[in-house]
């Protein structure tokens, strides 16, 4: 039985004292990052070489002796910052990303690593223990093993989001289930009018566009109105070419961040519900298109709607959930004419445009909804 890692995101509720300690860890991680970036650049200018991860960790002893406040921070957090610098440079050497830069207090992501072995749920109190921080209240719907050394974590990290909430992210091993699959294949067509149109055997399943729901429309309206208020306040506080950010503007921007986070949460939760429902049907295989989302985004009339649909997230969730349940996942080439091919006779209607919602076969006269037609062709696709 294969093994994979499952990622978790858990909300934390620290006290004021614990929150100050966590902010101190964030400052320390950023301080070490910037210091190591500076040392890497100086080393390169000297002899064109690179400081390895282990050499950076060895430097921590002398750095801590010069900065005594770092003794209040977990040593694993400091080592994690060195590891992050090394990872960033390795990705730069492979030409995956740009060269690592200094982190700003205002613009950088507020996060730090925590030691996996010392992160566990206490038996008596049921609180989450974090080294150098203490026992923290948390909220989750998942059940975890209780006791020291029971939670075998990987890549554990604390993050303070812009919405003002604390979370811990980590991964745990899980055994992929060898589920008993049905003999029905599944074809999934993604779209803007409907989020997903699914062909499953002789069944048709449609997941409506969550962005057209009343809840999302009202939330987007609140965001638009708040953006107008903030824009007018900036104009009212303009001095020459400079804009003065007042306390009221900061409060409104924090409120706007929380609304965006809520909207994003609604969309992602809906995708999780849809993908879970499809995977629970246990099809013998799942077939989807390999969409060119970047190319589709170039259409100025559809780019916003495509962005709101989160196509990449839908495909990503279907991939890993299929892997967990032992379901073969197939992605068809993006140039496969799933919408233009007649599901009855196989003829291709090359004149079909985006505005045509009904497919009419030029050969046999077969009429069908174009999205369901695409889902049927994907379901019947053979590698």
What residues fall within each predicted segment?
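Short, surface-exposed charged micro-motifs
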Residues: 11, 118-120, 157-158, 187, ...
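Non-catalytic, well-ordered alpha-helical scaffold segments
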Residues: 20-23, 27-30, 76-83, 272, ...
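Alpha-helical coiled-coil heptad-repeat segments used for dimerization/assembly
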Residues: 24, 31, 42, 80-83, ...
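Gly/serine-rich nucleotide phosphate-binding loop at the start of the catalytic core
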Residues: 1-80
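Stable alpha-helical structural segments in soluble proteins, enriched in small hydrophobic residues
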Residues: 36, 77, 81-92, 372-383
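Acidic carboxylate diad motif detector
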Residues: 54-161, 308
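A generic secondary-structure signal for well-formed alpha-helical elements
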Residues: 33-40, 44, 89-96, 194, ...
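Positively charged, helix-rich recognition surfaces that bind polyanionic ligands
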Residues: 6, 149, 162-383
């Amino acid at each position: 039985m294969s093994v994979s890692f499952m990622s978790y995101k858990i909300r934390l509720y620290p006290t004021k004292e614990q929150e100050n300690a966590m902010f101190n860890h964030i400052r320390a991680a950023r301080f070490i990052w910037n210091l190591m970036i500076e040392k890497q650049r100086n080393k390169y200018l000297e002899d064109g070489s690179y400081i390895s991860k282990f050499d950076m960790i060895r430097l921590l002893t002398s750095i801590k002796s010069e900065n005594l406040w770092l003794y209040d921070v977990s040593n694993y957090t400091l080592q994690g910052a060195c590891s992050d610098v090394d990872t960033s440079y390795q990705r730069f050497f492979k030409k995956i990303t740009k060269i690592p830069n200094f982190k700003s207090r205002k613009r950088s992501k507020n996060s730090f690593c925590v030691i996996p072995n010392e992160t566990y749920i206490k038996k008596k109190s049921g609180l989450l223990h974090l080294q150098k921080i203490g026992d923290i209240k948390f909220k989750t719907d998942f059940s975890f093993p209780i006791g020291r050394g029971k939670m075998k974590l990987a890549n554990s990290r604390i993050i303070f989001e812009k919405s003002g909430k604390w979370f811990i992210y980590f991964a745990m091993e899980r055994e992929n289930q060898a589920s008993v699959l049905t003999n029905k294949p599944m074809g999934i067509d993604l779209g803007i009018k409907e989020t997903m149109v699914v062909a499953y055997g002789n069944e048709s399943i449609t997941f409506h566009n969550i962005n057209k729901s009343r809840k999302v429309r009202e939330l987007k309206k609140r965001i638009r109105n708040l953006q107008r208020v903030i824009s007018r306040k900036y104009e009212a506080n303009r001095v020459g070419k400079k804009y003065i950010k007042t306390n009221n503007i900061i409060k409104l921007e924090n409120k706007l961040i929380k609304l965006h986070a809520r909207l994003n949460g609604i969309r992602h939760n809906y995708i999780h519900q849809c993908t879970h429902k499809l995977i629970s049907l246990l099809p013998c295989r799942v077939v989807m298109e390999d969409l060119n989302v970047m190319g589709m985004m170039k259409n100025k009339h559809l780019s916003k709607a495509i962005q709101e649909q989160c196509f990449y997230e839908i495909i990503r969730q279907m991939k890993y959930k299929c892997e967990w349940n032992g379901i073969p996942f197939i992605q068809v080439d993006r140039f496969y004419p799933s919408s233009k091919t007649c599901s009855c006779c196989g003829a291709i209607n090359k004149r079909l445009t985006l505005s045509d919602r009904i497919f009419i076969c030029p050969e046999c006269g077969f009429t069908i909804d174009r999205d369901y037609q695409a889902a049927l062709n994907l379901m019947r696709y053979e590698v």
